[in-house]
Amino acid sequence: MSIESSKGVWKSGPGRGRVRPKGRQLDDLAWSQVQDLLGQRPRRRDLLIEFLHLIQDAYGHLSAAHLRALAEEMRLSQAEVYEVATFYAHFDVVKEGETPPPALTVRVCDSLSCELAGAAQLQEALQQGLDPKSVRVVRAPCMGRCDTAPMLELGHHHIDHATPEKVLAAISAGHTHAESPDYEDLAAYRSAGGYARLEELRAGGDWQEVQAQIKQSGLRGLGGAGFPSGTKWGFVRSNAGPRYLAVNGDEGEPGTFKDRYYLERTPHLFLEGMLIAAWAVEAETCFIYMRDEYPAVLHILAQEIAALEAAGLVPAGYIDLRRGAGAYICGEESAMIESIEGKRGLPRHRPPFVAAVGIHNRPTLVHNVETLLWVARVVREGPECLNAVEHNGRTGLRSYSVSGRVKKPGVHLLPAGSTITDIIAACGGMLEGHIFSAYQPGGPSSGLLPASIHDVPLDFDTLQPLGTFIGSAAVVVLSDQDSPRAAALNMLRFFEDESCGQCTPCRVGC
């Protein structure tokens, strides 16, 4: 093959030449727009999902021209960029010749709690009452606000106890952005002694003494798996560095909202726990993977991480906040790590486990948000804050996310040995006119239990004889006015939608 110097064209045969490479051509305007959005950010492969968010946020969709330009800018194949963009539900990929979606999207939650509260009727009313050319109305999986069902997301603005009237009023007022609640900021947290223990440990603490405290407390992973937290630290430390810490904030199990509840109120209790764990395993970087359904939390964390950097408590860039994109499977730790690396969120085969081969193939400590809240408390108050609490033969405390037919849904911090009877009582009892009939003990993955099983402690290891488990302690209470069959179909529909399709039984059946 030679170059025809007079034309600057690659020649590969008589009369054959090509001025541009084969395939979809690069649009100069789209390339310029992508370059402007990315600015001075490094064009690293692991930032691909962050860059897709920038384009989606700016233009409301991902056009073929922008995807082509992003591939060029990052020196990736178009296929790589396209497969990642189409994997995640929150990216609207628009092919050439297709009409982009309307500028405004209403996502109506279709989780079990919201369905019980009339979400289907709400969605139907909105589809009939809004102009589809200007507003798109779609159903969406749980957004972690089950205590205020039915709820929806208008742009990035959540409307609790939603009605068509509330939605129309919000559209008219232009309320489409997230609203941050009042929370304890860095100054308030430090005034009450926050970060003092972290600074003491950094000045001369023994990580093994802290690990012993965590073990004595009985703290286990509170994202659902329940692995002993202190033991996990030892596994990660046994592998040569550099090491990382990853926070699993992808609270996607329907009915679960405890992490959001705490992060919207006391973000620094979580952040200090994270930094203590990072100190213990000598983590080079902390990655926080937070679900896209929590825009207010993302804003709060971005603000407070910047405050930590300004105060000199962490160097710039030490905490890397990453934004999910609407994939339930990324709640699984290895799928989350794939997503942090800018890939599709497909779970890895194990072994090796992430404690040895995690982010960028380095040892990685993975913890849930609530677990790290308790790390901070145990290190500050001592292991007794957990192990001194006993009820029904169980030790410790649990944050139960309770929704459904109870008077006071919400996050209830109760002894880990609490039964469903205890939990309903903590919620003020059943709603008027409703008789307790069944419950979901730990999200849809745990199935349904009848009201007759009301005296079993809802904790780790207590529900396995019944063929279920506590998981993330997402409790949904049903009454005699609800159909167990309809509830089961709701759960099955969720898993049908959210299956990544990697495993054959999930994809085609057993």
Predicted regions and their residues:
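Hydrophobic alpha-helical positions that pack around
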Residues: 298-416, 428-431
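Small-residue-enriched alpha-helical segments and adjacent helix-cap loops
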Residues: 48-143, 147, 209, 287-329, ...
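Conserved phosphate/anionic-ligand binding catalytic regions in large, soluble enzymes, centered on
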Residues: 215-235, 326-338, 496-508
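Hydrophobic alpha-helical bundle architecture
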Residues: 413, 422-429, 454-506
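Histidine-anchored nucleotide/phosphate-binding helix
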Residues: 88, 266-280
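Accessory "access/gating" subregions that flank catalytic or transport cores
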Residues: 201-239, 388, 401, 413, ...
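Iron-sulfur (Fe-S) cluster-binding modules
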Residues: 1-64, 68-71, 78-79, 83, ...
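Gly-rich Lys/Arg/Thr-decorated short loops/hinges at beta-loop-alpha junctions or inter-strand turns
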Residues: 15, 189-196, 245-259, 354-359, ...
